[in-house]
Amino acid sequence: MIRSLHITSLGIAALAAAIPCRAAGAAEISVAASATPLQAVVDAAAPGDVLRLAPGEHLGPVVLSKPLTLQGEPGAVLKGNGKGSVVTLTAPEAAVRGLRVEGSGTDIATLDAGVFAAASATRAVIEGNSIIGNLYGIQLHGARDAVARGNRIEGQREGRTSRSGNGVSVWNAPGAKVLDNDIIFGRDGIFANASKKNEFRGNRFSNLRFAVHYMYTNDSVIADNVSTGNIVGYAIMYSDRLQVSGNVSDGDRDNGFLFNYANGSKISGNAVHGRAQPVERWTSNGQRFAADPDTPKVAGEASAPRARTRIGPEKCVFIYNANKNRFSDNLFEGCEIGVHFTAGSEGNAMSGNAFVRNRNQVKYVGTRSLDWSSEGRGNYWSDNPAFDIDGDGLADNPYRPNDMIDRVLWQAPAAKVLVNSPAVQVIRWAQARFPAVFPGGVVDSHPLMKPDGIKETETP
């Protein structure tokens, strides 16, 4: 049975006296805003109680050492004292919902956070909160099967990115889920380390270093997330057997996706969109990049003349020593380089992807020949001037995104002045007619005539 109680700072002693007389089951306790620390109310509550915090300011920090729920009414603020974490969960099935949480400490070594879920806080739920201006937003520090869902997490706006914390950090928390959160500012949106069987789905990221940063985290799902205007969208490192699907990188700076020692994973249905971006994004020297000054500040206000720009991401995908992965049905468009593929990466399959309007579709400097088609299905290349006489949807000739001259230009950029020389044109003519002249590299033996079910961004 659930009973409703109302408590102010003057009623804490009365609550403590009433607890032995409480009917079986949890109580729902209304807590008025007060200058008295909330911890006293928490200490007096019984396991299973719901503490419903009224609008106004409630003083932290607070530790939930029993399975309680902090439920905020609209306008309820839980404010820390600038030291340590604002809320620390140490009990199984503890929950924090509907609160504005602010005022953590600033010590990176002690992982000061808006909400910190310890290893003992299994199945903790952190849902529907606004977690604003803390060093770390949410720490799932060993909290198995914990869930962070539907929160707005805003990190520190000022100072160097390297001195900020992450929106959500997951360390050794098998089964933890991070779902449908909005994460802006700070260092990384989600940082996972030494974990497994996690699910990161439906989150939105902006103004960060990495939207998702994965380290030593296996058998997990990264799906349906959106990264906008970050330095790197999705950095997947030292992790195996991942499902990476339905994610978007839109206007990130360096890489849409980065795979470093990531193995045995399926990467499908993702999209990377390159954009012209202000050059200041590359020259901020670690400081936070202010909003594009060309963007109107008031609705209807005319834009100023556009500053110098360059294309970002520089690489839609960077694959470094990543092995036995399958890339299928992804869209890579508008980047300086579609895919930068290193020679140390082996056994990867590429099919059904669309490479659209990248200045260089592929950069591969190895000498081994790689066929980027699988079971008679290759990829779509927007710069492939091909014919399909038999109408089977496949180009009649193989497609090679690079040639010998490209390799020379990567190794000696100054040679660019010779690109239109007669000697270079003769070499390219010979390569086109005598494939044996090619020194190895990427070839798509069954290129697609159109992007299979992948919608390109319309150009103005």
Predicted regions and their residues:
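Extracellular beta-strand/beta-solenoid scaffold signature
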Residues: 80-88, 108-117, 132-140, 160-172, ...
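Bacterial N-terminal signal peptides
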Residues: 9-20
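Functionally critical loop-and-helix segments that line ligand-binding/catalytic clefts
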Residues: 271-320, 325-460
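Boundary at the C-terminal end of the N-terminal hydrophobic targeting segment
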Residues: 21-26
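Extracellular beta-strand-rich solenoid/capping regions of secreted or surface-exposed proteins
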Residues: 39, 43, 47, 58-71, ...
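Extracellular beta-strand solenoid repeats
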Residues: 52, 63, 71, 79, ...
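Acidic Gly/Asp/Thr-rich repetitive segments characteristic of extracellular carbohydrate-active
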Residues: 27-57
